[in-house]
Amino acid sequence: MKKLLFGVLVIASGLVFFSCTQKSGFLGADTLKTIELVAADSQIDNIVEMASYESDVFSLGNSSVTTFSAGLKSAVPGGGFFNNMFNLFPNFKLRYMRGICPDLTITTTNGGFPKTMTVDYGTGLELANGHILKGKIIIVLSAAPFISGSTRTVTFENFCADLVCISGTSVKTRTKDTQPKFSETCNFTVTLANGTTINRTAEHVRSWIAGSDTEFNPADDVIAVTGKVVVSDSKGNEYSKTITVPLLRTGVCKFITKGVIEYKNSTGKFATVDFGNGDCDNKASRTTQNGTTEITLGK
């Protein structure tokens, strides 16, 4: 993996390597506004998907959901909940830099459901892949997570990843498929470092194609995401995005590693973004009628 510095959504003035051949099927000329919008939005996709996976790490662990109860908190290895976790699942600490994990509190009524999990990152906690998280993720589980029809309601409270802050709620529902699969509806507000706010309403399907049977071991996790997002922002931009090739998220990479998103506005399709062939790097390619450009997903 490339060594990367922090600082997401700092958009470079030259997004380099334009093709000289025009592409058919795209409407509207390239403008600086379009270039910046797609580059920034691709970085936001990466952050939002990382935050969703982070909620999965905790709420899909049957041991934490069904075995542990209230008041389990420890920000450092060697005490309480995470002492048990490190003994039972030593690979879990590999997700967090120096093995320092967020506080976790689980509250329940008489040991049953619903259960509420609060994951607290405090004022800043670093993942092993370089993201810095702060704030809280609050997860309410209606039942054990792999029971068909069970729901997980995930709320982001004062939550930020690097320089991107997320507020709002998603609901993940276990489908009847044999493969671990969850339908997801999201209503998020994303705030960037420059004060821009972005409203995102999404319908996704998240399929665990590997790793769901090894609790708290991010090394073998692979998730495929499909669906659509409707976006509006404080600068007056409105558009929709459809995932035409499933996005792949692994448990150890900082970035989306594969997949294609198609962008449309009121005039039609204006861009696509290809996240690559599965390699773990911070590059994606953006295609419009003027050709293909390499963009950066973060630092």
What function would you assign to each model-found segment?
Residues L5-S13:
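Sec-dependent N-terminal signal peptides
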Residues M1-L4, Q22:
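Positively charged n-region of N-terminal signal peptides that target proteins for export
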Residues Q22-K299:
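Low-complexity, intrinsically disordered segments exposed to solvent
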Residues V16-S19:
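C-terminal motif of bacterial Sec signal peptides marking the signal peptidase cleavage site
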